[in-house]
């Protein structure tokens, strides 16, 4: 995990993330019975949200890179997964796409999902250097000490989605109209 010096190289992490993303796309489009399975519009909503989330992840990396860039792959994967989840929910018309909804959803998703995965990855990578292995006590300590960092990261992601989320979604909507991804 540490710049290709651990059990996984960054390229391998990217490949696993891409496979997970594609599996999520296949799962998100599996419920559409009336539309042909090869029709791209089935998964267009989640794809647009994943692209918006990846752009937000890249912008947050450019403005706040931090001292350690070894978790860049994790950041992209989790932002993409959060975008996919947002796309599935927005596609089913359960949530309106406004600044407040995007902000709340981003905060909760980054705090719970991204923070949870990062804390587990810290436990897994740290257990390789100790003889103790995994324990629930270690996981509890990691989650409690990680709350301030998870809150800060969720807050920053929320700010970026409130500022840049709707303009990016509007631009992607224009692209969808321009290239005829909408059915008339």
Predicted regions and their residues:
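Small-polar-interrupted transmembrane alpha-helices in polytopic inner-membrane proteins
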Residues: 1-2, 16, 20
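Hydrophobic/aromatic-rich structural module bridging two neighboring secondary-structure elements via a short loop
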Residues: 5-13
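Membrane-helix exit/interface motif
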Residues: 2-6, 26-33
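Membrane-embedded alpha-helical hairpins and interfacial helices in multi-pass inner-membrane proteins
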Residues: 10, 29-184
